[in-house]
């Protein structure tokens, strides 16, 4: 059921070629003290200010962070997708008692987020290399927030 709902909203791919991750490039660029992540093309997926890695650079991440207005102190947050870990870093800093789980399908994205984007690594931040939709379909877990 969840897979069908997410598929309707996010054009979830069921074609096997969607999972041929070796063909999807993961690249990092830098310009004017901003480091950016590109997945599969030159579109900026995530950006980080090298002088202030916690600050949110892209408008869509700023809008997504507004969820804290409605749920200021979540205990458990699930992120479906890691990218450059912009939201993970922001929530990690401002939600000090929260535990986080991130589902990321592309192993190179995880590696790049840790190596180039200061992705937090400790007991509060779990990153699982898996298909987020399949994970949600197969696990009956509850979270205060699910962010994708």
Language-model region placement:
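The AdoMet/dcAdoMet-binding core of the Class I SAM-like
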Residues: 19, 54-148
């Amino acid at each position: 059921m969840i897979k069908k709902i997410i598929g309707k909203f996010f054009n979830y791919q069921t074609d096997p070629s969607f999972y041929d991750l070796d063909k999807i490039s993961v690249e990092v660029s830098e310009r004017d003290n901003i480091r950016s992540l590109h997945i599969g093309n030159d579109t900026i997926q995530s950006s980080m200010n090298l002088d202030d890695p916690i600050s949110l650079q892209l408008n869509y991440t700023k809008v997504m962070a507004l969820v804290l207005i409605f749920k200021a102190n979540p205990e458990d947050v699930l992120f479906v997708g890691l990218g450059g870990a912009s939201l993970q870093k922001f929530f990690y800093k401002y939600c000090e008692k929260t535990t986080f789980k991130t589902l990321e399908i592309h192993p190179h994205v995880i590696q790049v987020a840790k190596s180039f984007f200061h992705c937090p690594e400790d007991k509060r931040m779990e990153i699982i290399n898996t298909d987020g939709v399949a994970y949600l379909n197969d696990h009956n877990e509850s979270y205060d927030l699910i962010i994708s």
